[in-house]
Amino acid sequence: MAEYEIDEITFHKRLGILLTSWKNEEDGKTLFQDCDSILVTVGAHDDTNPYQKSTALHTWLLGYEFPSTLILLEKHRITILTSVNKANMLTKLAETKGAAADVNILKRTKDAEENKKLFEKIIEYIRATNKKVGVFPKDKTQGKFINEWDSIFEPVKSEFNLVDASLGLAKCLAIKDEQELANIKGASRVSVAVMSKYFVDELSTYIDQGKKITHSKFSDQMESLIDNEAFFQTKSLKLGDIDLDQLEWCYTPIIQSGGSYDLKPSAITDDRNLHGDVVLCSLGFRYKSYCSNVGRTYLFDPDSEQQKNYSFLVALQKKLFEYCRDGAVIGDIYTKILGLIRAKRPDLEPNFVRNLGAGIGIEFRESSLLVNAKNPRVLQAGMTLNLSIGFGNLINPHPKNSQSKEYALLLIDTIQITRSDPIVFTDSPKAQGDISYFFGEDDSSLEDGVKPRKPPTRGTATISSHKGKTRSETRDLDDSAEKRRVEHQKQLASRKQAEGLQRFAQGSVPSSGIEKPTVKRFESYKRDSQLPQAIGELRILVDYRAQSIILPIFGRPVPFHISTLKNASKNDEGNFVYLRLNFVSPGQIGGKKDELPFEDPNAQFIRSFTFRSSNNSRMSQVFKDIQDMKKAATKRETERKEFADVIEQDKLIEIKNKRPAHINDVYVRPAIDGKRLPGFIEIHQNGIRYQSPLRSDSHIDLLFSNMKHLFFQPCEGELIVLIHVHLKAPIMVGKRKTQDVQFYREVSDIQFDETGNKKRKYMYGDEDELEQEQEERRRRAQLDREFKSFAEKIAEASEGRIELDIPFRELAFNGVPFRSNVLLQPTTDCLVQLTDTPFTVITLNEIEIAHLERVQFGLKNFDLVFIFQDFRRPPIHINTIPMEQLDNVKEWLDSCDICFYEGPLNLNWTTIMKTVNEDPIAFFEEGGWGFLGAPSDDEGDDSVEEVSEYEASDADPSDEEEEESEEYSEDASEEDGYSESEVEDEESGEDWDELERKARQEDAKHDAFEERPSKKRHR
């Protein structure tokens, strides 16, 4: 538990509230029973009984439940007896000066004799306070710790007068501060999301499609939703920064239908089948140990009487909210509501509930705030109530079947008391039009005052289709979503075409989109004096300093720069050695003529020299020196091109007058000097610095001006939590060029033993197993909070230049961007893979289009290709995406306004982009990217205009690296006329229309630029 943080300010503030109430003469006498001390014992964690006064006190004061802990409250001191590890967390509470009471921490070890002395010390403290001890008698505790305490306390228990102090604590817990209200509000948001976004959709599906499911199974299905993190991270839920690790159910959801209803909070879901008449559902979540509750009634084909009763219930609840305000007496509220029923609907009085709810907070049901006619308590601003209003055992005069004879109506909401109208935290839809479902084609059953339902829109819960006649609502939604996506893609394609024509309009850009290589001048020596002294020997010299080869030609030394040398070869023939030097010149067979510019290609060039010598060892050494120098020159040129975009950042402006914001014990990728050691990150004025522990000058500086993206990825489903920086321009880290720098910490399975500071691994199966598992979850949550908070500080320090981005795991899909199958996760601005190296960061607003390849029936995977707006950038391929995720990928691309096309085959994008770059204006004038969406031959399109200008190959992707000679021979064979396969097709008896179609396709292919020669002709 070493990762927990105890808020000492909150602790002492709330402890002061408790002591003030306790010392108050009236409260001390009536609520605390004049007790002189309060004894609170908590044993092992009990999931079956989470709502107890003792654990509520722990949560309220400390922020957490501390199992195996004893607290003794006195009016001048609080004593806490707990394990060593927990005690270390609480030590700072005792160091606070000017607190309302002293804090005394006692550390319990595994020494039984020492623990016995500590228990006896607690008893001595109690004896010194007049022996009247306040306890919480309804709490049930168990475990080894409780057994040890009872063995000491039970023999002397008769000495003390034990009184019930529950009401005193309840008053202190009743009024919530801002932090507590925020927790209840967060829990309520989740409850509303599950009710309106999950339960309603599932309920409508079951009823609409006539599927059978029991109440208990439906309830279990909802309860398991808490493990579905993707659902809670859906943007449409608008849950904000809810920490899912702090979320839990208050109780198993209660679902009732089919004539059997129980409106009590203690109701249990039965095993009867779900029935489409009147369905009641109530559920509640706890967030950071604070509860919420919401309940709704859903009506299926209701008659006019049911609608009338429900409308009255909604109006009654509205009045109930009006009565609940600061200063109102709880008993009077119930009496007023009952008076309204007697005045307007006396027939419903026997069916009205006996109480209208209770207080809610750390405890799900604060019984001291029970809303009934007998409670004299006065409501105060800051209190929170769980209001439950309803009518039970109602008789349906026109039942459709035996299960519809009786029904009930129920509304439950969580509210905050204010000085005016209360704040309703659970604003799930409850109007008549939102909860009524009609299967009939006409609306004759509607009462006059209720308007017919509008056609359902996306996200509504209404079932308006006729059962057995039309398709289900889900199918309709899918079809409408597909139509909307297709229409949106057409708009995006038109926009891309217009942007391309405008971007490459005549005169706005050079006619060629390819940057032409420039002529490089090499000068070996500026003057004769720089030549080596050995030139007088008229031998072949290799001058490393000048990067030149000096050749004796007609008795004169002639230098040739190494860059002019193409290759060298050595042959032994008899007693002589032949050294041949081939030089670069235009027009060479197999040469890359376009990449080798010359000042005057029509000038005369020396292509080769051949030297003969009888000195074998000398020529061998010369040949080796030439080879080595050529390799070194080639390596330098490669490195120059590779590091051409590497920049040298400005200097980091450090914060000198104080310790900058920092985070410790983080690793960096790429590692400095190849050594994996934890360091720390500091935030300075114009950037951040990662400092290695090796030496002071071993660090990485990242300036805000060079940061392009900042990501935080939580450790959910991962082994690390990380902060990732994607740079605008690469930098050098050690000897490596990098554009991505990542800081991370591993989520290990190591914890500290509570009896010391030695690390030990989990020992699953011992008595602390549940506590340790909970410890691991909380450790992960703590890591997420720590890293996210630091990432937010980085974004804040950048003064708006960068924004923090977090991956959406619910939108993730698997794919292979490099060699490994990884999980790619969209963010607001990017598509990323940050867990494994090499990293993937694709900026969405730099994408021109996307192309889905190998999309055809029978294949299990498809590929995704991104083409960038900068056509000189090579496209990025993400291969082997499961076909099950095709619709999700399409929906994501469409939601990001990315125009995409799909096709059945892989395209040769190297050839395509080369053609596009050669003349981008002509490309867009001839239709641009529209060729990707043109129908293929097997779809039966006979129009010449629709023929794709690029022909896809069904060959293996590895075939894209074929020799040029093979491509030329294939071109020639196709230009000569029909291929052999076509001749065979003709002989097999094709009709004239088929032959004419092929001829038109062949002409169109040769008139336009093509992808690459295909070994087979596709039909």
Curated annotation (Swiss-Prot):
<dbReference type="InterPro" id="IPR011993">
    <property type="entry name" value="PH-like_dom_sf"/>
</dbReference>
<feature type="compositionally biased region" description="Acidic residues">
    <location>
        <begin position="936"/>
        <end position="994"/>
    </location>
</feature>
<dbReference type="GO" id="GO:0000791">
    <property type="term" value="C:euchromatin"/>
</dbReference>
<dbReference type="InterPro" id="IPR048969">
    <property type="entry name" value="FACT_SPT16_C"/>
</dbReference>
<feature type="coiled-coil region">
    <location>
        <begin position="767"/>
        <end position="799"/>
    </location>
</feature>
<comment type="similarity">
    <text>Belongs to the peptidase M24 family. SPT16 subfamily.</text>
</comment>
<dbReference type="InterPro" id="IPR013719">
    <property type="entry name" value="RTT106/SPT16-like_middle_dom"/>
</dbReference>
<dbReference type="Pfam" id="PF14826">
    <property type="entry name" value="FACT-Spt16_Nlob"/>
</dbReference>
<protein>
    <recommendedName>
        <fullName>FACT complex subunit spt16</fullName>
    </recommendedName>
</protein>
<comment type="function">
    <text>Component of the FACT complex, a general chromatin factor that acts to reorganize nucleosomes. The FACT complex is involved in multiple processes that require DNA as a template such as mRNA elongation, DNA replication and DNA repair. During transcription elongation the FACT complex acts as a histone chaperone that both destabilizes and restores nucleosomal structure.</text>
</comment>
<dbReference type="InterPro" id="IPR033825">
    <property type="entry name" value="Spt16_M24"/>
</dbReference>
<feature type="compositionally biased region" description="Basic and acidic residues">
    <location>
        <begin position="470"/>
        <end position="490"/>
    </location>
</feature>
<dbReference type="GO" id="GO:0000511">
    <property type="term" value="F:H2A-H2B histone complex chaperone activity"/>
</dbReference>
<feature type="modified residue" description="Phosphoserine">
    <location>
        <position position="445"/>
    </location>
</feature>
<dbReference type="GO" id="GO:0006260">
    <property type="term" value="P:DNA replication"/>
</dbReference>
<dbReference type="GO" id="GO:0140713">
    <property type="term" value="F:histone chaperone activity"/>
</dbReference>
<keyword id="KW-0597">Phosphoprotein</keyword>
<dbReference type="Pfam" id="PF08644">
    <property type="entry name" value="SPT16"/>
</dbReference>
<dbReference type="GO" id="GO:0034728">
    <property type="term" value="P:nucleosome organization"/>
</dbReference>
<comment type="subunit">
    <text>Forms a stable heterodimer with pob3. The spt16-pob3 dimer weakly associates with multiple molecules of nhp6 to form the FACT complex. Interacts with abo1.</text>
</comment>
<keyword id="KW-0804">Transcription</keyword>
<feature type="modified residue" description="Phosphoserine">
    <location>
        <position position="444"/>
    </location>
</feature>
<dbReference type="InterPro" id="IPR040258">
    <property type="entry name" value="Spt16"/>
</dbReference>
<dbReference type="GO" id="GO:0006368">
    <property type="term" value="P:transcription elongation by RNA polymerase II"/>
</dbReference>
<keyword id="KW-0227">DNA damage</keyword>
<keyword id="KW-0175">Coiled coil</keyword>
<dbReference type="GO" id="GO:0006335">
    <property type="term" value="P:DNA replication-dependent chromatin assembly"/>
</dbReference>
<dbReference type="InterPro" id="IPR029148">
    <property type="entry name" value="FACT-SPT16_Nlobe"/>
</dbReference>
<keyword id="KW-0234">DNA repair</keyword>
<dbReference type="InterPro" id="IPR000994">
    <property type="entry name" value="Pept_M24"/>
</dbReference>
<dbReference type="Pfam" id="PF00557">
    <property type="entry name" value="Peptidase_M24"/>
</dbReference>
<feature type="region of interest" description="Disordered">
    <location>
        <begin position="930"/>
        <end position="1019"/>
    </location>
</feature>
<dbReference type="GO" id="GO:0035101">
    <property type="term" value="C:FACT complex"/>
</dbReference>
<dbReference type="InterPro" id="IPR036005">
    <property type="entry name" value="Creatinase/aminopeptidase-like"/>
</dbReference>
<dbReference type="InterPro" id="IPR056595">
    <property type="entry name" value="Fact-SPT16_PH"/>
</dbReference>
<dbReference type="InterPro" id="IPR013953">
    <property type="entry name" value="FACT_SPT16_M"/>
</dbReference>
<dbReference type="InterPro" id="IPR029149">
    <property type="entry name" value="Creatin/AminoP/Spt16_N"/>
</dbReference>
<dbReference type="Pfam" id="PF24824">
    <property type="entry name" value="PH_SPT16"/>
</dbReference>
<dbReference type="GO" id="GO:0031491">
    <property type="term" value="F:nucleosome binding"/>
</dbReference>
<dbReference type="GO" id="GO:0006325">
    <property type="term" value="P:chromatin organization"/>
</dbReference>
<dbReference type="Pfam" id="PF21091">
    <property type="entry name" value="SPT16_C"/>
</dbReference>
<dbReference type="Pfam" id="PF08512">
    <property type="entry name" value="Rttp106-like_middle"/>
</dbReference>
